[in-house]
Amino acid sequence: MCDEAVWAPQAAALAGHDCRVATHGLLDSLTLMARKALDEAPPGRLSVAGHSMGGRVALEMQRLAPERVERMALLDTGFAALPAGEAGEREKAFRFGLLATAKSRGMRAMAADWARGMVHPRRLDTPLFESVLDMLERSSVMQFEAQIAALLARRDASAQLPGIGCPTLVLCGAQDGWANVAQHEALQRGIAGSELVVVPDCGHMSTMEQPEAVSAALLRWLAR
């Protein structure tokens, strides 16, 4: 659902690096997304950063081709599978409810509901919030449906974490309501030698909400 706009501040700050933003089209599997990103990336070793669902794609890239992933940054993301039982059913109902809104009222109407939990409360109904809505509106209902399918079928990466040996940054907003700090603390504990950065005054859309802090963390990570 996110496009190049989510990384625009970092692309400017990292202008000395070859920064590319992967696209997933109508792919409905995180593994297929990871394979496409690997196939379309330049040959050789890569510094892979992923935000939200993209963090899960980054983990899949590392699982599929660990020899190609030189370092990894996981932003505002998760590593667990869909919960069993009632929690999983609630997540399904929530996501399918959003999809129904997108189909009946359009992507922007859906985004206006969904994105209210994505940013720090003080950024609601601000130009930044509108830019998030603009970005989500650029996606199609079919893309949204495909990404829901991918996320509901997500793999539990817990067993993968101890084997990750590349320099890894784990970053989230202190007020991320979608992927909370405790979730990122668990992710950081699972990856030996990884660094945890919690960005103050920041929700889920860290790259857009606190671009300077995120860019600074990425520059430190690239220097490792």
Q: Model-flagged regions — what are they?
A:
Residues C202-S215:
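Catalytic histidine-centered segment of alpha/beta-hydrolase-like enzymes
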Residues R63-L64, R68-R105, A109-A112:
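Flexible "cap/lid" loop of the alpha/beta hydrolase fold
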Residues E86-A87, S104-G163:
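Conserved alpha/beta-hydrolase catalytic His-Asp/Glu region
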Residues M1, A174-D176, D201-G203:
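Acidic beta-to-alpha connecting loop that harbors the catalytic carboxylate
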